[in-house]
């Protein structure tokens, strides 16, 4: 499990404020791809184009990288829910996508 410190506090739907995410990549299963794809849809509906968070793997949608990291955060951070993804700052979204690349996909 890796810890990501947020650039700004995040207030969850339950009212709790958090300053870091626990990314539990080891807990991810193939069925979590459905959740990641839902997050990709949410991201796509909220912004034009993709989040460009690196060029390590141009074949993997940058939004999917961010979504996979967020699903890992949901698995590891108590109280974090899928609807909290749109509250994450752009800086944190970019960094989460890079975290996914370096700590999960190319570990």
Report residues per predicted region:
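Short, surface-exposed, charged amphipathic helix/loop patches that serve as local interaction elements
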Residues: 1-107
């Amino acid at each position: 499990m890796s810890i990501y410190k947020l650039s700004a506090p995040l207030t969850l739907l339950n009212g709790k404020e958090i300053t870091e995410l626990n990314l539990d990549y080891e807990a991810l299963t193939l069925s979590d791809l459905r959740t990641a794809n839902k997050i990709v849809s949410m991201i796509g509906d909220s912004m034009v184009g993709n989040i460009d968070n690196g060029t390590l793997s141009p074949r993997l949608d940058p939004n999917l990288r961010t979504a996979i990291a967020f699903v890992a955060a949901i698995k590891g951070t108590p109280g974090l829910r899928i609807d909290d993804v749109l509250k994450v700052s752009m800086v944190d979204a970019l960094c989460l996508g890079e975290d996914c690349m370096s700590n999960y996909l190319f570990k």
